Amino acid sequence: MVQVPEKICLALRAAILVFALAGCATAPPPALISQDEPAPVPEPPPPPKIALVLGGGAAKGFAHIGVIKSLESHGFQPDILVGTSAGSVVAALYAAGYGGFELQRIALAMEEKAFSDWTIPNRGFIKGEALQNFINEAVGNRPIEQLTRKLAIVATDLQSGELIVFERGDTGLAVRASSSVPGVFQPVKFNNREYVDGGLVSPVPVKTARDLGADVIVAVNISDRPKLSRLKDTIDVMMQTFTIMGGIIAEKELAFADVVVEPDISALNSANFESRNQAIIEGEKAGLQALMKLKEKIAAYYEAKNAQAVQE
């Protein structure tokens, strides 16, 4: 038998040992996968961003407070508030942190003369500074971007006719601009531009709410309806014309809202503060009637999001 030198034997043994260790390092035993492990649960979708859009309508705007009370009583809190004209007043106060009952208390205690700083007619009978000061005092002089809720206020550029959205800056000034009915309030001058009532171009600013990222939009329409009775004079004819024009614009925007709330306030006078309590009551009624539709829209949102997550 051939004798293998001892050194060669030791070298062979070392080589075999190295290869064996290398095999252990590069080829670990396969992991055992249980067939009973459940599929990973998808992350729940984020809650929908709910926007409350408050339209214009002068003294009928008190109905917005009733709608807010109804929504609050059933746990609905909007993430985004958008207001135009009278709706901007309520939207600003609500965005500042006032609840529905607090808004009602403020509404019933306010006096019309507090907003009526009459002046010699030049380009309007009312300056609007009193309204601006009232709002700023009520919100603690906070600018729009520092309010409790996201707020957007719509006005109209008097020179270009463009829709302008205030998302920052002086809250009272924005509300004043949005509420400056041409011929009644003086136009609001700001940054070398002049602004008037937002209801001229967007009586119920649904599109603005969608642009701000709202998933579910609740729009409150308090616009006047055309009168079916005989129009007595020139003023009646002019007002009827404006009502028809505003109604057409409002209908186009409302078509893109998820929930439309329309309080029964046709019998109330837009210029009469004395009917404010009745307006609030009618707003509450309409808000309650809209709750089921709102719940359905929120459920549909979650259903769509969950279906999207499964596909991904």
Model-derived features: where do they sit?
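N-terminal secretory signal peptides that target proteins for export/translocation
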Residues: 1-8
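Patatin-like phospholipase
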Residues: 2, 13, 24-81, 93-312
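Alpha-helical transmembrane segments
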Residues: 8-15
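Gly/Ala-rich beta-loop-alpha elbow adjacent to hydrolase catalytic centers
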Residues: 83, 87
